[in-house]
Amino acid sequence: MSTKLQNQRRGGRSGLISGMKFEEMFRVKHGGHKPDRRLDLWNEKKTEPKTDSINPGGDRYSVKNPKTPSTEIQVQVCSVERFCRRFGIVGSLRESFDMFFGSHKDLLGMSTYKNNPENFKRVCESVWGIDTKNLSPKWEIRRCRLTADNVRGVENITEWFQNNIEEVTRFVLTESFNNTDNIETIANKMAWTTTKNDLDSVRVFDIEEIVKEVGSLKCYIKDSRTVFKVGLLDLQMKGSGKGSHYHNMQFNCSYNQIKQLLNDEGSRI
């Protein structure tokens, strides 16, 4: 295993542990508690609540502790399969998602998710009908996905996100795959630190206020051609982890982006 990959994994584990510790500090300070994991919206398997702390007043907080106010952090990760099932995405649009995220079933195995050029070219040519001669060795062949310029029907992805921007934002920030009948798992507030690990720096936003405002924002493909701007959110292929996790959808945003959208620094608790 390369030193770079080892460092990425250590960083990911360290960030997760740090985040969990801060969430517990938040709960202790405000007398909150974390809800239990409940069955998902299909009643098939338990899923992680979007709520990190239910405070005594009943508000349900999603707690974020970024390095700086401008740091974009992960706010939702999921497989293309579950996302498309949740939103009823099928047919040629689903195929476009699979091209962009590299989520075709033959690209999700431990030996095929990355650095398997022959298998990736086979999927491109025999499944998708994509000519592989001019694909980028670094950004496409190595990573077993297509960038936006080579995704057939990519404009339909952008259009779909534009037409569903409020529902997608609500999914990312408040619901995930939780059953909305289990209200304790559904976040209604976001609590962001403006100084890392500083409980006194926390600013709070109402998520429905965010959802109301994103309807005025545009969806487009960013200059890198590997990221969709979905209103407030940046959406990319995860690009880390092993197997199918490497090709997950990862949504990111920052405190400053929300502050700018609402023209509001957020309230204190």
What are these regions (language model features)?
Residues S2-D59, K64-I269:
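Short, positively charged
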